[in-house]
Amino acid sequence: MQPSTNIFSLHGCPPSYLSHIPTSSPFCGQNPNPFFSFETGVNTSQFMSLISSNNSTSDEAEENHKEIINERKQKRKISNRESARRSRMRKQRQVDELWSQVMWLRDENHQLLRKLNCVLESQEKVIEENVQLKEETTELKQMISDMQLQNQSPFSCIRDDDDVV
């Protein structure tokens, strides 16, 4: 970037803000800039070569700066690609682990279902046996009740001949 310069100071014309200075000054016909006659010890050709060398130096610096920026962009691009690759690999590992868990859980679920079916079958058998035992209990209670009634009847001392031992 080159600094902006006032074009009036380059051509010897006073800027508009100096319009209050009379034109009949001792500088009439000369450059009113007090630094115009300042001797630098550098002639015009040296000054121009210095400017052009500064321009080429600034052009080289700008080129170097652009190269550095491009190198950084390339490195960042490569780094981003590598980071994206690592991220994809990490996600793939997570997906693989999740699938492994799914398979393990499915197997576990099947085993639990088999056990549940066995328990349900056992429960049915126990329920059937329980019903059968209740029926037997009811029958036995009825028999006991009948026997007690027979023992309490007034004719309990008379027995059939079949009952005698």
UniProtKB/Swiss-Prot annotation:
GO MF, one annotated term: DNA binding
UniProt cross-references to InterPro entries, sorted A to Z: AtbZIP8/43 (IPR044521), bZIP (IPR004827), bZIP_plant_GBF1 (IPR045314), bZIP_sf (IPR046347)
Protein source organism: Arabidopsis thaliana
Residue ranges annotated for the bZIP domain, each copy included: 70-133
Subcellular localization: Nucleus
Subunit text: Forms heterodimers with BZIP34 and BZIP61.
One cellular component term from this protein's GO annotations in UniProt: nucleus
Disulfide partners: none
Region of interest (Leucine-zipper), residue spans: 98-112
PROSITE patterns: BZIP (PS50217), BZIP_BASIC (PS00036)
Sequence intervals crossing the membrane: none
Region (Basic motif): 72-93
Name of this protein: Basic leucine zipper 43
UniProt keyword list: DNA-binding, Nucleus, Transcription, Transcription regulation
General function of this protein: Probable transcription factor involved in somatic embryogenesis. Acts as a positive regulator of BHLH109.
